[in-house]
C-alpha cells in the first residue's frame, strides 16, 4: 500500500449497542472493502475498540463508518478517536478481529 500519500493511524472506541450485533464482523468487512489495516475487538465494558491505519482519505472513510453506520443491528451512541498520527509505514498487513 505504497501510495506516496501520507499514512495515518488512529485508535477508536465505539459506544452504544455494539456487542452481540456482529459489529466486529461488519467492521472487518468494511475495513477490507475500504482498504485499511488494523484490528477490532470487544472490551469488557461493552464497547468495541481498535486501530485503523492507511492512507488519510481511507482512514477518514473508516472513521465516518465507525461513527455513523456500523452493523445493521447496532446503535452507535458515540465514537471516540485518539492517538491520530502520521506514520511512515503500516504496522499491520491486514484488518483482523482480535479476541
Swiss-Prot record:
Keywords: Acetylation, Hydrolase, Phosphoprotein
Secretion signal span: none
Single GO term (MF): acylphosphatase activity
Residue positions where N-acetylserine is found in the record: 2
Domain of life: Eukaryota
Keyword Methyltransferase in annotation: no
The protein's Enzyme Commission number: 3.6.1.7
Domain spans labelled Acylphosphatase-like: 9-99
Principal EC category: hydrolase
SUPFAM superfamilies, A to Z: Acylphosphatase/BLUF domain-like
Residue numbers annotated as active site: 24, 42
InterPro entries in UniProt: Acylphosphatase, Acylphosphatase-like_dom, Acylphosphatase-like_dom_sf, Acylphosphatase_CS
Catalytic activity: an acyl phosphate + H2O = a carboxylate + phosphate + H(+)
Phosphoserine modification, residue list: 93
Function field: Its physiological role is not yet clear.
Family label: Belongs to the acylphosphatase family.
Name of this chain's protein: Acylphosphatase-2
Gene: ACYP2
